[in-house]
């Protein structure tokens, strides 16, 4: 009662980090599996929805190690793509989200999580490419330590932008608020 009491009888949850599979896929392989094929994204979204989820969070920015140049693999410690995308990386990421949208239809909300891996121009290009898929929000497409970079992305793509887990003080958020760059914190 002191802090206002209960305000919501229910809270919405989303199925998170589907790029690592979902229950049926994990049980089948007995481990987390990083998904590369868009068909697998279709399947895991269907599985999550069968469990009652109407929103999912996906990071589509991964590539098999054998496709990464060795210098890039050493610099990124694995499958994550950092910085600039090659054209086929962009296409593959969009295909994964397209498969999720196809699986979920218009009633599914899709959150695209990038874990701050991309540079500003690549994040803007990917955001533009994802616009037709009705993305709920585009989370941390690049590092939030320079709010001007988020402003650059916001000016170039129409997706709602989100950040917050890597900004820690009111000063870390101040410029975002002043520029009205963020849609979700």
Task: For every predicted segment, state its role.
Residues 65, 145-146:
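A ubiquitous, low-specificity "background" feature that marks scattered single residues
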Residues 118-128, 148, 168-180:
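Catalytic cores of alpha/beta
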Residues 1-109, 117, 124, 128-132, ...:
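N-terminal capping/lid subdomain adjacent to the active-site entrance of alpha/beta enzymes
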Residues 156-157, 180-181:
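Short, structured coil segments at secondary-structure junctions
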Residues 57-59, 84-90, 111-116, 134-144, ...:
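Catalytic beta/alpha-barrel core
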């Amino acid at each position: 009662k002191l802090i206002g009491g209960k305000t919501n009888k229910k809270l919405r949850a989303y199925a998170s980090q589907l790029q690592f599979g979902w229950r049926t896929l994990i049980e089948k392989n007995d481990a987390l599996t990083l998904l590369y094929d868009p068909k697998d994204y279709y399947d895991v979204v269907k599985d999550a929805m069968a469990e009652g989820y109407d929103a999912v969070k996906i990071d589509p920015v991964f590539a098999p190690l054998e496709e990464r140049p060795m210098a890039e693999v050493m610099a990124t410690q694995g499958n994550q793509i950092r910085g600039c995308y090659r054209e086929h990386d962009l296409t593959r990421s969009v295909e994964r989200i397209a498969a999720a949208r196809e699986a979920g239809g218009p009633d599914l909300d899709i959150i695209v999580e990038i874990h701050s891996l991309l540079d500003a121009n690549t994040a803007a290009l990917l955001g533009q490419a994802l616009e037709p898929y009705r993305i709920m929000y585009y989370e941390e497409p690049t590092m939030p330590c320079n709010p001007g970079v988020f402003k650059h992305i916001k000016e170039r793509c129409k997706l709602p932008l989100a950040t917050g887990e890597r900004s820690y003080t009111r000063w870390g958020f101040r410029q975002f608020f002043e520029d009205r760059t963020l849609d979700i914190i």
